[in-house]
Amino acid sequence: MLTWKLLGLLVLCLCAGGISGNGDPSPGSTDTHEEEDSPPLPLGPPIPGDPWPGAPPLFDEPPPPGSNRPWRDLPDSGAWPPKPPSTDPPKPPLPDDPWPAGTQPPENPWPPAPEMDHESQEEPDLDPPQEEYR
């Protein structure tokens, strides 16, 4: 079974031209033809305005004026040019009312803070003296 697969692979390579039938171990002559058919490289600096030899044009020729260009067919809706923004004075912002209806919350819902002494206080000793252990 393996020999039939190998034989089929060999026939496929021969038909595709991957193996030359004349037994010549040198590479095929198709590589040299490609190099000979390519245009010669320019001999010197490029001339401004002349296209690079062998380079295809980047863009097609523009269509003649007056031809149908769908991107230029804008509807006559009067939307162009756009209207400038209105010059009305800005309106004051509406007050944020989290309680639109019902009973209103008290003015200050927080309890009063405890009274504090604003006199100078001694800071606590963060590093108390240690007793010596013997």
From Swiss-Prot:
One of its GO terms (cellular component) is extracellular region. The keyword Secreted applies. Its main location: secreted. Residues 1-21 form the signal peptide. It is found in: Secreted. Residues 18-134 are annotated as: Disordered. Residues 122-134 have a biased composition (Acidic residues). Residues 39-67, 81-98 have a biased composition (Pro residues). InterPro entries: SPR1. Keywords: Secreted, Signal. This is Psoriasis susceptibility 1 candidate gene 2 protein homolog. It comes from Mus musculus (Mouse). The gene is Psors1c2.
